[in-house]
From Swiss-Prot:
Annotated cofactor note: Binds 1 divalent metal cation per subunit.
Family matches, as HAMAP family: IspF
GO molecular function: 2-C-methyl-D-erythritol 2,4-cyclodiphosphate synthase activity; metal ion binding
The keyword Metal-binding is assigned to this record: yes
Pathway(s) the chain acts in: Isoprenoid biosynthesis; isopentenyl diphosphate biosynthesis via DXP pathway; isopentenyl diphosphate from 1-deoxy-D-xylulose 5-phosphate: step 4/6
InterPro entries: MECDP_synthase, MECDP_synthase_CS, MECDP_synthase_sf
SUPFAM superfamilies, alphabetized: IpsF-like (SSF69765)
S-S pairs: none
Protein name as catalogued: 2-C-methyl-D-erythritol 2,4-cyclodiphosphate synthase
Function: Involved in the biosynthesis of isopentenyl diphosphate (IPP) and dimethylallyl diphosphate (DMAPP), two major building blocks of isoprenoid compounds. Catalyzes the conversion of 4-diphosphocytidyl-2-C-methyl-D-erythritol 2-phosphate (CDP-ME2P) to 2-C-methyl-D-erythritol 2,4-cyclodiphosphate (ME-CPP) with a corresponding release of cytidine 5-monophosphate (CMP).
GO biological process: isopentenyl diphosphate biosynthetic process, methylerythritol 4-phosphate pathway; terpenoid biosynthetic process
Cofactor: a divalent metal cation
Family, similarity comment: Belongs to the IspF family.
Amino acid sequence: MDFRIGQGYDVHQLVPGRPLIIGGVTIPYERGLLGHSDADVLLHAITDALFGAAALGDIGRHFSDTDAAFKGADSRVLLRECAARVKAAGFTIQNVDSTVIAQAPKLAPHIDGMRANIAADLGLPLDRVNVKAKTNEKLGYLGRGDGIEAQAAALLVKEGA
C-alpha cells in the first residue's frame, strides 16, 4: 500500500476587531486572527498537511493570499476544496491529528465542534479527526498572547496502490 504522511503549520497574529475562528468555530474573544481569509489557523494547517501528503504543494499555491478571490474566504470552503483536489489526485484521507497552541482563550469547550466541522468537511468519521489544545506556558510570542499557532499531520493512502 502507498501511504503518505503530510505535516502542516500555520500561525496568525491576534488583533482587535476581527472574529476568532478556529476549526470553523467562532470563539467569543476580544481579538481575532489577522489574515487575508478568515485566518482559521487550524484549518490552514490541516489544509497544508493534506496538500503536502499528496505532494500538491501548499495552501498558498492553491489559494494565494494575494488573490482577491480569497479575500475573507471561509477556510471550511477551502478545506473542502483541498479534500476534493487530494481525492482527484487519487488519494483517500485516512486521518488527521492536530494541535492548536494558544495562551488564551481556553479552547477545550470548542474542541468537539472543531472536530465535527473537520470530519464533516473531509467526509471522515469523527474518530479519525483529533484536535488538541495547548498553551505555550507564557513563553515567547504565543505565551504573550500575540498570536495563535497550529500544527497538523495527515495520513493518506493512494487508491488502487
